[in-house]
């Protein structure tokens, strides 16, 4: 059992207020959630790349839409960076994939190719956004370190 701490108590007290403030102050978010729930009454939603998403219940529609968009985006991102990495480097020699966890890809590489690999990883965000036809591009940047602990 987790012991009570001042931090835990404050998170419980103010966490819901932060969520309410975010919802209230993010223009269009409430409308998007309501429109998504309204569309969900038909039992399915259309996700990125026109994928059909099957719902268990209308109240979970927005979460399903977000989760599927994240998964589709990450798959496209991985395709983009893999194509570019393999144009310049040999998998298993200069670089290798270690893990792909939710919204992060872990790569190990030779020290002399860190910079060009970081450039490929950074450019991959725009390439994936373009490939998926997003109006607002996802942005990100790689973290470099000797371990998972150093990069997170």
Spans of features found by a protein language model:
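Conserved catalytic core of nucleotide polymerization and phosphodiester-bond processing enzymes
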Residues: 1-152
